[in-house]
Amino acid sequence: MSFKEQVVDPFKLFCYQTVYYAVKCIPARRRNARLLLVKSDEIGDYILIRSCLGAFRRSVAYAGHHITFLGNVSCRQLFETYDSGIADEAIWLDKKRFSRNLFYRFHFLMRLRQAGFSDAINLIYSRSWRTDDQLVAVSTAANTVAMQTTDLPISPLERTLTPAHLYTRLETAGAETLFDAGRNSRFIHGLLDMPPEPVTTRLTVGAPPAGLSLPRTYFVIVPGSGHRDKRWPTENFAATARQLTRQYGLTPVICGSPADRQETLALHAVLGEQSLDLTGRTSLVDLLAVLKGAHCLISVDTGAVHLAAAVGCTVFGLFSGFHYGRFAPYPEAMTSRFFAIYPGETEEKIRSGRLAARDVPVGEMAKIPVEKVLRVITKNWIN
């Protein structure tokens, strides 16, 4: 075991537990008809659930409830632009500060406890005790609901510290390989005893800001990812971009958040003036508009592939096969222009039915050769 596993992580868990029990010990009054919805995971996860969130407002079960939505701060602009009507108020969680700053953690959990919720629903399928479950556990809610899920790969210590009966009700959410948008719809509409609605992620978006000076014809590359193992070599992106420029006359537009700057700057340095670097220059809504006007997106497994699919942009996404089925490939009924590209070994296991999606290392996508990506793009290109 590493020093992190032996010392750092147990110390973090001890600190988190101390804060949790300190908050739980503080008296708080439960108030009637106050519903908490927890969806604090990432942008892609939000895209795959947002069309279902309005069902709570329309339901008989929660008619007249004051609804509070708790989300990841990275999704705030999407929520405020498209979905603010689904809740009476929203609370935004900075997950980095929540994991690193015990004062922030304490005050955030205290805010949830003192809000006096009567009901709490955790909308996250892959949950962890230290983050997602504690948001519900500190609340005053008498009725707590979540999806039944398989265990995450956590340490024996964290498993021991996780309370045995966190939720008063666990709903079956379908097979592990079920596409998450379908899983979310099934869970929410089943919980509310409402007929299911067609599953969609579609978003309407306007023109990109004129100040971005986009080329007339272009494709988008998103080389960065919040997960350090979800990487495809810079030289592979560059070789792919050069071929698309030669073959189709398109300009590569590099996009990403400021956190992706290491990957985007490296790619822009290789491609030079033949590319446009928009790293850190687009809001999420701006990025949607850029993707809407693009001929296609080439990206690793990250939220960008779901943003692109939501505005009808053709997606060529690189995936390891980890969580196969949940986030890719997209069902044909949702889009026919989403092309998930996997390493050869993963593809063989998919064909033979031997793929254990959780056992695939996330970093396997680095093994995908440029030639394979170009074959998929050429085969599915639309002028």
Label the predicted regions:
Residues 1-383:
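Catalytic machinery of carbohydrate-active enzymes
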